[in-house]
């Protein structure tokens, strides 16, 4: 489970659901055993009090700095997002999948995707591809507070959106949506 997310803490949360490890006593004894066997390692994230665990074979990633910053659009059920509290504590990003939330109670939208740039959540958006149309529509776009928009970020967003459109089989994102929602904050 730790490997599928990349890292986890021992706190209750979505990352531990299933596998009979949502019970904290069982989970903590398994973590202790994995630590003793050297299969996982403990580390701390600045400003988070609880320790995190990573597979020993993955520890090289802890000190690895990526020079390649890309924009990624995460699916609502992406492994990284399983533990919403962990994401909030590490990235200061509060995310909720509102697909089952009544329309009147939604903060954002029906199917909203987080936008990750390097190691920072910079926004979220609600895409929509209508049957028979070649363009991807943007129903909404929300920037996270404090994001500095510059030419490099826009270039990376365009690259990410092109990859996303290609993945979906769309020819392109609707230019009016892009200009009105993304470029004109």
Whereabouts are the PLM-identified features?
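Long, charged, low-complexity, helical-prone intrinsically disordered regions
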Residues: 1-185
């Amino acid at each position: 489970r730790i490997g599928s997310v990349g890292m986890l803490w021992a706190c209750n949360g979505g990352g531990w659901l299933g596998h009979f490890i949502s019970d904290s006593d069982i989970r903590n004894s398994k973590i202790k055993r994995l630590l003793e066997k050297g299969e996982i390692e403990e580390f701390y994230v600045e400003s988070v009090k609880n320790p995190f665990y990573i597979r020993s074979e993955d520890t090289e990633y802890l000190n690895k700095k990526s020079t390649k910053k890309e924009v990624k659009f995460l699916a609502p059920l992406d492994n990284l997002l399983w533990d919403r509290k962990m994401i909030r504590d590490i990235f200061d990003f509060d995310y909720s999948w509102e697909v089952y939330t009544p329309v009147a109670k939604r903060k954002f939208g029906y199917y909203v995707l987080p936008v990750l740039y390097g190691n920072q959540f910079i926004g979220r958006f609600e895409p929509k591809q209508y049957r028979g149309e070649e363009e991807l529509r943007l129903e909404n776009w929300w920037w996270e507070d404090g994001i500095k928009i510059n030419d490099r970020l826009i270039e990376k967003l365009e690259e990410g959106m092109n990859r996303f459109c290609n993945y979906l089989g769309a020819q392109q994102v609707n230019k009016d949506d892009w200009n009105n929602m993304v470029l004109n904050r």
